[in-house]
Amino acid sequence: MKRAVVVFSGGQDSTTCLVQALQQYDEVHCVTFDYGQRHRAEIDVARELALKLGARAHKVLDVTLLNELAVSSLTRDSIPVPDYEPEADGIPNTFVPGRNILFLTLAAIYAYQVKAEAVITGVCETDFSGYPDCRDEFVKALNHAVSLGMAKDIRFETPLMWIDKAETWALADYYGKLDLVRNETLTCYNGIKGDGCGHCAACNLRANGLNHYLADKPTVMAAMKQKTGLN
């Protein structure tokens, strides 16, 4: 039996990953992390979606220690989430240092326990928000370290790594879940479901990708299929 664990926030990217994983694996588990995030409404959204989509199990792990260590606008109410700035340079204040290091490591431990062969994460390098822990180089390096440390080949899969947001919408549509991802996921840094606040970087990436996809579905769908190998 093929098993996978999805690092699941209830947002656009991880929900799209879950939708695909359910088609590719016999048994899919979801792991969601409570780190005291500003947008912690995502935890309830993740619970609802994991149940609705048919995950075998959904584990919510308390990692609030991260909130004490990692200073970010997503972990401190006193630091405002900035509006999207297209010309901004450097790492944004929404970056939570160590978050994906912790999440992927804990997800791998869970995968070890449930005998899953893969940990799936929705990180992406093509239009990411400037986070160093969304890079392919990082994921591969951590995957190597974790596999060595556990003496077990647990594969980190990144199905969205080389597709952009428009193509991620196309992937959701490919599996017949475009409306669900648009209306029932939570991507917004300010914790607003669906189309979100419309001002933060997460909402901007999501909206621009959707508009691009809806404006030229055939071209974007074809590009997504070519990059992912789907028919």
UniProtKB/Swiss-Prot annotation:
The membrane-spanning stretches of this chain are none
Its EC number is 6.3.4.20
Q: What is this protein called?
A: 7-cyano-7-deazaguanine synthase
Statement: the UniProt record of this protein carries the keyword Nucleus: no
What's a Gene Ontology MF term here?
A: zinc ion binding
Q: Which family does it belong to?
A: Belongs to the QueC family.
Q: Which reaction does it catalyse?
A: 7-carboxy-7-deazaguanine + NH4(+) + ATP = 7-cyano-7-deazaguanine + ADP + phosphate + H2O + H(+)
Q: Mind telling me which CDD domains this protein's record contains?
A: QueC-like
Cite the Gene3D superfamilies for this sequence. Answer: HUPs
Which residues are involved in binding Zn(2+)? 188, 197, 200, 203
NCBIfam families, sorted: 7-cyano-7-deazaguanine synthase QueC, PRK11106.1
The Swiss-Prot or TrEMBL record lists the needed cofactor(s) as: Zn(2+)
The pathway is: Purine metabolism; 7-cyano-7-deazaguanine biosynthesis
Superkingdom to which the source organism belongs: Bacteria
Q: Name one GO biological process term.
A: queuosine biosynthetic process
Its biological purpose: Catalyzes the ATP-dependent conversion of 7-carboxy-7-deazaguanine (CDG) to 7-cyano-7-deazaguanine (preQ(0)).
One matching Pfam family: QueC
- Which keywords has UniProt assigned to this entry? ATP-binding, Ligase, Metal-binding, Nucleotide-binding, Queuosine biosynthesis, Zinc
Instruction: Give me the comment on cofactor binding.
Output: Binds 1 zinc ion per subunit.
